[in-house]
Design a protein with these regions (language model features):
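Mixed-charge (Asp/Glu-Lys/Arg
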Residues: 1-109
Length: 109
């Protein structure tokens, strides 16, 4: 399960995580991680192509509702629209590509 792999990656890097009891019907939150003094909600998506802009926009709305920061972690490609939403957001970061590999690779920084 991709969600569990992400949480294990954060733990391997020394961060405290909060797991969901289930990953289906999770309301868009696939787990949580505490980084410094902030709680981040995690959205995990496995894509082959470009990530859906709608998913990024919905996650941003969810973060506003929860007044929380968030990490949108995915295996696909980040299109211009999704990048723009992430850059404009004060709450959300997208983790993909090399950053995702570094997170999932024990011993990397």
């Amino acid at each position: 399960m991709f969600e569990e792999l992400l949480l294990e990656g954060f733990e391997a890097h020394g961060f405290r995580t909060i797991r969901n009891k289930r990953y289906t019907g999770d309301g868009g939150i696939d787990g949580q991680v505490i980084i410094g003094k902030y709680r981040y909600l995690i959205q995990a998506k496995r894509y082959r192509g470009h990530i859906a802009l709608q998913h990024v926009q919905e996650f941003e709305k969810l973060l506003k509702r929860h007044n929380c920061r968030g990490l949108f972690c995915h295996t696909g490609k980040t299109g211009a629209g999704s990048k723009s939403v992430s850059i404009a957001s004060e709450r959300m970061e997208i983790i993909s590509g090399q950053r995702l590999i570094d997170l999932l690779t024990p011993g990397s920084s």
